[in-house]
């Protein structure tokens, strides 16, 4: 007989690889993860055939988030938030390049991997080599960005690791500047919009001021995520709060799978938005190609 979910521990699980570090509790994983996603098929399989346009994904390379209480949360990019949108993009015909800030391997929250979801697992296996040997973002900026770049979109997946480094990176700022100046898409979800904070780094005003976004609700990181042991403590800062201070408009205060398009910025509120955000990105990119 399977264990009753209410008997599962709400205490975060120690990560023995690091001092005072913790994975989410068994109970929180029973609430937040599942063996399958809501993937319901690809809408535009093979629709893009020219081979020029690609997606640049900026992945997280740091696993640990230091919290207010001195504990560390053992995290990474959320596999559903990364791989399900990319499944839609890759199946439509767009190639994907992976970059991290230093060129170190991307980190994933494998405890959130939907192990029975063929779309996610297939995409993970296709990208595994690139995830382990990504490009260095500074090299991409130097050699592959510019008005004639082959990248049509920049994708920043979520997972709490997105709040480490990516949110205060000059290279991320340069990448976002390039996307805005060259009319390319910026696609991100859940905690990934923390990367948008880099756009306002050392500036009086963010170029994204006035944009509307979906983001993971601060109220969950301050409340339920701690209460059920998903996080082992409070974050030092909150994504939606700081985005609001930079003049962006956060349109959600809950987690429903909502997505939003504001100009070329495409956002989703949580892992629940992964499937629809992938569809939205494909539709918008195909429309942009047709109109070029």
Swiss-Prot record:
Subcellular location: Cytoplasm
A single MF term (Gene Ontology): glyoxalase III activity
Record-listed E.C. numbers: 3.1.2.-, 3.5.1.-, 3.5.1.124
Catalytic residues as annotated in Swiss-Prot or TrEMBL: 190 (nucleophile)
Principal localisation: cytoplasm
InterPro entries in alphabetical order: Class_I_gatase-like, DJ-1/PfpI, HchA, Prot/Nucl_acid_deglycase
Claim: rRNA-binding is one of the keywords in the record: no
GO cellular component: cytoplasm
Compositional bias annotation for Polar residues: 1-12
Catalytic activity line of the entry: N(omega)-(1-hydroxy-2-oxopropyl)-L-arginyl-[protein] + H2O = lactate + L-arginyl-[protein] + H(+); N(6)-(1-hydroxy-2-oxopropyl)-L-lysyl-[protein] + H2O = lactate + L-lysyl-[protein] + H(+); S-(1-hydroxy-2-oxopropyl)-L-cysteinyl-[protein] + H2O = lactate + L-cysteinyl-[protein] + H(+); N(omega)-(1-hydroxy-2-oxoethyl)-L-arginyl-[protein] + H2O = L-arginyl-[protein] + glycolate + H(+)
Any one of the GO BP annotations: protein repair
Source domain of life: Bacteria
Keyword Hydrolase applies: yes
Keywords in alphabetical order: Cytoplasm, DNA damage, DNA repair, Hydrolase, Stress response
Disulphide bond pairs: none
Gene3D superfamilies referenced in this protein's UniProt entry, alphabetically: 3.40.50.880
Region (Disordered): 1-23
Annotated family: Belongs to the peptidase C56 family. HchA subfamily.
Cited function: Protein and nucleotide deglycase that catalyzes the deglycation of the Maillard adducts formed between amino groups of proteins or nucleotides and reactive carbonyl groups of glyoxals. Thus, functions as a protein deglycase that repairs methylglyoxal- and glyoxal-glycated proteins, and releases repaired proteins and lactate or glycolate, respectively. Deglycates cysteine, arginine and lysine residues in proteins, and thus reactivates these proteins by reversing glycation by glyoxals.
Protein name: Protein/nucleic acid deglycase HchA
Organism field: Staphylococcus aureus (strain bovine RF122 / ET3-1)
């Amino acid at each position: 007989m399977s264990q009753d979910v209410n008997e599962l521990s709400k205490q975060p699980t120690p990560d023995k690889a690091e001092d005072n570090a913790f994975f989410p509790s068994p109970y929180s994983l029973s609430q937040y993860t599942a063996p399958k996603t809501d993937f319901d098929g690809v809408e535009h399989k093979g629709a893009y055939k020219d081979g020029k346009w690609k997606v640049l994904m900026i992945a997280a390379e740091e696993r640990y988030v230091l919290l207010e209480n001195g504990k560390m949360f053992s995290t990474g990019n959320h596999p559903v938030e990364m791989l399900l949108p990319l499944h839609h993009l890759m199946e439509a015909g767009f190639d994907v390049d992976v970059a991290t800030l230093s060129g170190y391997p991307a980190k994933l929250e494998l405890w959130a991997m939907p192990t029975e979801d063929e779309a996610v697992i297939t995409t993970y296996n296709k990208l595994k080599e690139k995830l382990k040997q990504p490009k260095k973002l500074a090299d991409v900026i130097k050699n592959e960005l510019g008005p004639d770049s082959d990248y049509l979109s920049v994708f920043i997946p979520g997972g709490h690791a997105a709040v480490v480094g990516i949110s205060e990176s000059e290279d991320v700022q340069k990448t976002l500047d390039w996307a805005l100046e060259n009319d390319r898409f910026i696609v991100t979800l859940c905690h990934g919009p923390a990367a948008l904070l880099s756009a306002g780094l050392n500036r009086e005003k963010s170029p994204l001021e006035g944009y509307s976004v979906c983001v993971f609700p601060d109220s969950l990181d301050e409340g339920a995520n701690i209460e059920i042991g998903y996080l082992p403590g409070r974050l030092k800062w909150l994504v939606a709060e700081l985005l609001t201070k930079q003049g962006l408009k956060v349109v959600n205060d809950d987690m429903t799978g909502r997505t939003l398009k504001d100009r070329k910025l495409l956002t989703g509120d949580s892992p629940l938005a992964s499937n629809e955000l992938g569809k939205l990105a494909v539709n918008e990119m195909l429309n942009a190609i047709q109109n070029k």
